Swiss-Prot record:
Family: Belongs to the AIR synthase family.
Protein localization: Cytoplasm
Keyword vocabulary terms for this entry: ATP-binding, Cytoplasm, Ligase, Nucleotide-binding, Purine biosynthesis
GO BP field: 'de novo' IMP biosynthetic process; adenine biosynthetic process
GO cellular component: cytosol
Associated pathway: Purine metabolism; IMP biosynthesis via de novo pathway; 5-amino-1-(5-phospho-D-ribosyl)imidazole from N(2)-formyl-N(1)-(5-phospho-D-ribosyl)glycinamide: step 2/2
EC number: 6.3.3.1
Record protein name field: Phosphoribosylformylglycinamidine cyclo-ligase
Length: 345
């Protein structure tokens, strides 16, 4: 026998009791997201989910994402309640552009020291995002890793699986000359461009919490949760012939629209069809950012762009607006062999 101190996992910086307390805190809100296809509850080694029986040839669609350095801004401002919505939105919006209905979602939360209140706030936001998109939060991983993260700093990642009928996959192959492009308004910068946002804040020397923009703090504009378009877009897909959908994330207009365009087509965007929300004007002015760089980095007020036949454009816009979206004609598709896939004029 020796007189050495007996060490525990907690002595090493990992508090299993805190992790268990977190699970107890979130059980109720997670249960609210449950779908009928989900089998079992939290706590299993894996989550089980049956395929909805309405699909004849179901195709699974998967996606994973994070929220980038918007998370750093949220941590600096100690505002954790909506970052979970952002996390879900970035995943489910990527699924729905292919026509997929999100089925279930999992999250990964890693931190240097687990703060149960902060983690519960984030996961409550994740559950809210799942409710907005109709998918079940079936599980996740909370990793307390002392030495890997500074103090209570944390990172999050999300993973989502959806399903689409094989014959109804939206892949852009039907896009053709004369299609109309319909825009869906964003709620702000969503979850992209925040390294530039934070650089602009640093260079300009402003305090986002005390700087007023349109009657509310700049921080409110910058941390507005990413809009989730799933239910509106699925209703649209069921009503009109949608040819393609682009989710405007990293890379902005220049990189995301071409991802859904067939060869020998070009998207013409009418810059006069909408006004940038004030937060983008502030960012451009405060950072002296060029117009081209703005369209490359930010969504500039446009969260999604939908291509569909011109004859169905008015019906689509009316349906989307009835669902609470702000939709408008933003441009059209023309035949072109130009290497410039997107023109903003």
């Amino acid at each position: 026998m020796t007189d050495k101190t007996s060490l525990s996992y907690k002595d090493a910086g990992v508090d299993i009791d805190a992790g268990n307390a977190l699970v107890d805190r979130i059980k109720g809100v997670v249960k609210k997201t449950r779908r009928p296809e989900v089998m079992g509850g939290l706590g299993g080694f894996g989550a089980l989910c049956a395929l909805p029986q309405k699909y004849r040839e179901p195709v699974l669609v998967s996606g994973t994402d994070g929220v980038g350095t918007k998370l750093r801004l949220a941590m600096d401002l100690k505002r954790h309640d909506t970052i979970g919505i952002d996390l879900v939105a970035m995943c489910v919006n990527d699924l729905v552009v292919q026509g997929a209905e999100p089925l279930f979602f999992l999250d990964y939360y890693a931190t240097g020291k687990l703060d149960v209140d902060t983690a519960a706030s984030v996961i409550n936001g994740i559950a809210e995002g799942c409710l907005q998109s109709g998918c079940a939060l079936v599980g996740g991983e909370t990793a307390e890793m002392p030495g890997m993260y500074h103090g209570e700093d944390y990172d999050v990642a999300g993973f989502c699986v959806g399903v689409v009928e094989k014959s109804e996959i939206i892949d852009g192959s039907k896009v053709t000359d004369g299609d109309v492009l319909v825009a869906l308004a964003s709620s702000g910068p969503h979850s992209n461009g925040y390294s530039l946002v934070r650089k602009i804040i640093e260079v300009s020397g402003v305090d986002p919490q005390t700087t007023d923009l349109d009657g509310k703090p700049l921080a409110d504009h910058l941390l507005a949760p990413t809009r989730i378009y799933v239910k509106s877009v699925l209703d649209l897909i069921a009503s009109v012939d949608v040819h393609a959908i682009a989710h405007l994330t990293g890379g902005g207009f220049w990189e995301n629209i071409p991802r859904v365009l067939p060869d020998n087509t070009q998207a013409i965007i009418d810059e006069s069809s909408w006004q940038w929300p004030s937060v983008f004007n502030w960012l451009q002015t405060a950072g002296n950012v060029s117009q081209h760089e703005m369209y490359r980095t930010f969504n500039c007020g446009v969260g999604m762009i939908i291509a569909l036949p011109a004859a169905e454009a008015d019906k689509a816009i009316a349906l989307l607006n009835d669902k609470g979206e702000n939709a408008w004609k933003i441009g059209y598709i023309k035949a072109s062999d130009s290497e410039q896939r997107v023109v903003i004029a």
